[in-house]
Amino acid sequence: MANLGCVEINPWNSKVSQLDFPDYGIIDLDPPEGMDFKNVIRIAKEFKSVLNDAKIPGYCKTSGSRGLHIYIPMGANYTYEEVRNFIKLLCHFVGERLPKIATMERRIKNRKGKIYLDYLQNRRGHTVASVYSVRPIRGAQVSTPLHWHELEEEILQSDFTIKNISERIESEGDLFTAILGKGVNMEVVLKSLLKISCSTCD
């Protein structure tokens, strides 16, 4: 693998045994180059607020590059299209709350320097860097699971590298084990999101 330059690990969202039914949905917070990481954290915290209100479990990790990834367990109960539409809805919620720094515009030139809320990674065959994957960038940064409270601290992508990730896992454990759990009941959480939307309109 080293000879081929295979540094990153980019798995599918589904297992071989259930290829059409993802184990989790991913919200990819993709900032433009030069964007203050504090803005990425602000958006992640807004997602956490929405998830908490709707009682949706969510797990955050660094991308290992510039952004953050938020994973939601789906339990291989829904198709890629259903999961993608669900994640798209969550992105709409947050995009409407933070329109000055967040966008769902696909074309980079039309994003106007905003952070892209990417739900399209939830398509069959699309991938993001795996949890604990090393990224092929200066410093050998690692895509690392976070406690949500760590977003309150002055964290940087460069805090998590190939040199210290083993020590972190020993001290914190594997924070991403739960993403392979039974998953959300989409019908129930959609009703919760509808209530949140209605209360906001009031």
Model regions and ranges:
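Short, contiguous, pocket-lining structural segments
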Residues: 39, 62-64, 82
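Active-site palm subdomain of RNA-directed nucleic acid polymerases
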Residues: 48-62
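Short beta-strand
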Residues: 58-64, 105-109
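Short amphipathic alpha-helix segments
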Residues: 39-51
